[in-house]
Each structure stands twice: as structure tokens, then as C-alpha cells.
Amino acid sequence: MNIERLKMSLGEAVFTQRSMRKLKPDAIPDEDIRLLLEAAVKAPNGGNHQLGRFLVVTDRKKITEFGALYREAWWAKRKDDHGWSGPQDIPKGETNYNAAMGLADAMKDVPCVVFALTVPPGGANSI
């Protein structure tokens, strides 16, 4: 692992982080993805269980298909919970829903999707 590429201190990373809802569509180098996944598996977790796996998708066609399914599922959940069928139904001032809707709309354009797959302790491996 090439940790020299991580130029930011831990404190700076923790205290300056922010949510990113607008992402560049640029491809992410495999080396960067590997570095992030290596950091993820080194992070503390409950009971020190390292039972997870990662599924990394960088194929544009698959991401576009996933993005469409994600958006469809997002709106289905809003319809079930609130009766909303589109942006016009979101009450004014519901900024969290507007931001989440933006992510649902943009999911098709992200450069990479990482699925974290877990297995409960004593459970069978499955997706």
C-alpha cells in the first residue's frame, strides 16, 4: 500500500470532511480504489469482525443500469412512505429530501460504485 500518497493528517481529514453529493464522472484509478478499500478494511469495527467483501463496479453500462434502478427504488420508497410521485410533491423546505433526490438522479453518472457485502457472524456467505 502506497500510504505516502495520503498527504493529509488524520485530524485534518476528520475535521475538514464534508458530504459530496456532486461527483465528477472521471474514472478513478484502480490504485486509488485499492488504497481506499485497504483503508476501509483497516478501520475499527464492532467485535473486530473482518467478514465483509467489496464489490467494485466501474463499468459505465452497469453503473447506468444501477443508477436507473436506484432512482426507481428511491421514488418507490417516497411514494410508499409519503405518496410522492415526483419532485413537485416534496414539500418546500424539505432540503434533506431534495439533496437525496439529487443523489438518486445523479447515481447513473458516478464513476464507481462500491458495494460493501457483509456476512453476519456464523451466517452463510451471500450477497
Regions found by a protein language model. Name each.
Residues 16, 39-42, 69-72:
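Residues within well-ordered alpha-helical secondary structure of globular protein domains
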